[in-house]
Curated annotation (Swiss-Prot):
It comes from Pectobacterium atrosepticum (strain SCRI 1043 / ATCC BAA-672) (Erwinia carotovora subsp. atroseptica). Binds to DNA and alters its conformation. May be involved in regulation of gene expression, nucleoid organization and DNA protection. GO terms for cellular component: bacterial nucleoid; cytosol. Pfam families: YbaB_DNA_bd. It is found in: Cytoplasm, Nucleoid. NCBIfam families: DNA_YbaB_EbfC. It comes from the Bacteria. This is Nucleoid-associated protein ECA1177. Keywords: Cytoplasm, DNA-binding. One of its GO terms (molecular function) is DNA binding. Belongs to the YbaB/EbfC family. The keyword Cytoplasm applies.
Length: 109
């Protein structure tokens, strides 16, 4: 079922992947990504833990209506969260690449 090397080889791969996962999680936690809305009029920077680090609002929006500004802030945050999720997914793909997992094996994360 596991081919030459058997379960020992699979366990070694799992340990290597666990080490790579820990490294990737540390990298992502330190990562900062900026989301935008309104063609860059509102920018929100969040870290890998989805904590807001910075909010930038173009001064021209301060005179507009409050509801529109709130919508732009929410959209910018959602854009930043989407970008973090994409980055996490890309980094996860690099962690699991090269592993010889059995067909149908699902990752636990």
């Amino acid at each position: 079922m596991f081919g030459k090397g058997g379960i020992g080889n699979l366990m070694k791969q799992a340990q290597q992947m666990q080490e790579k996962m820990q490294q990737m999680q540390e990298e992502v936690a330190n990562l900062e990504v900026t989301g935008e809305s309104g063609a860059g009029l509102v920018k929100i920077t969040i870290n890998g833990a989805h904590n807001c680090r910075r909010v930038e609002i173009d001064p021209s929006l301060m005179e507009d209506d409050k509801e529109m500004l709130e919508d732009l802030i929410a959209a910018a945050f959602n854009d930043a969260a989407r970008r973090i999720a994409e980055t996490q997914k890309e980094k996860m793909a690099t962690v699991s690449s090269g592993m010889q997992l059995p067909p149908g094996f699902k990752m636990p994360f």
